[in-house]
């Protein structure tokens, strides 16, 4: 047993309705007991089980909320679509290339470049409170480039999803059935 009492939580959002009868499960002046990396107990500090922990961490009065879950990400890509976003915000027609612009940049990028960018995005997500990410391919659009994207994604994520038909690639613009057969 390696349990730690975490106290100094001004507000805990537990998502456990047993705490306050709401879906949020808000507890004021709260504490957690963590067993290795899993929550063993949560509730009001005054109700914390005694002698159930070996160490104590005092957070100094912060709020604690569950980690965010991002259920739709593409971590492996190259390029930048800010010009497309700007055009849309200005009410211009969508002619910026969109996904296909990103596909071209991703195909041209090295594995090392794609991996560095994916690692950076994972770090930024974690620092912003996202603790669970589902990531998918979708910016290769050839069998080889999709497999390359999935291999890179597996280096930064436990679960990855194949999205080979994000859009039809330019080289299959008029041959949709052939592309579906390829994928």
Residues of each region from the PLM?
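N-terminal metal-binding scaffold of metallo-dependent hydrolase/deaminase domains
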Residues: 1-50
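Conserved beta-strand scaffold positions in the cores of enzyme catalytic domains, especially
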Residues: 5, 53-58, 160
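Fold-independent oxyanion-binding glycine-rich loops
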Residues: 8-9, 36, 59-60, 117, ...
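Divalent metal-coordination and catalytic microenvironments
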Residues: 9, 32, 37, 61, ...
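Metal-associated gating/positioning segment near the N- to mid-region
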Residues: 48, 59-117
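Metal-coordinating catalytic core of metallo-dependent amide/deamination hydrolases
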Residues: 100-117, 133-183
């Amino acid at each position: 047993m390696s349990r730690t009492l975490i106290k100094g939580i001004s507000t805990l959002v537990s998502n456990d309705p047993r705490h306050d009868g709401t879906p949020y499960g808000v507890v004021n002046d709260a504490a957690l007991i963590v067993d290795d990396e899993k929550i063993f107990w949560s509730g009001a500090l005054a109700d914390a089980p005694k002698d159930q922990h070996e160490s104590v961490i005092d957070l100094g009065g912060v709020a604690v909320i569950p980690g965010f879950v991002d259920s739709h990400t593409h971590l492996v890509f190259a390029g930048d679509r800010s010009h497309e976003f700007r055009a849309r915000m200005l009410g211009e027609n969508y002619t910026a290339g969109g996904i296909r612009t990103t596909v071209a940049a991703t195909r041209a990028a090295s594995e090392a470049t794609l991996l560095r960018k994916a690692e950076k995005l994972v770090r930024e997500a974690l620092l912003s409170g996202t603790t669970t990410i589902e990531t998918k391919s979708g910016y290769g659009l050839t069998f080889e480039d999709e497999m390359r994207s999935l291999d890179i994604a597996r280096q930064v994520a436990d679960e990855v999803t194949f999205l080979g038909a994000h859009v039809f690639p330019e080289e299959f613009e008029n041959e949709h059935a052939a592309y579906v057969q390829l994928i």
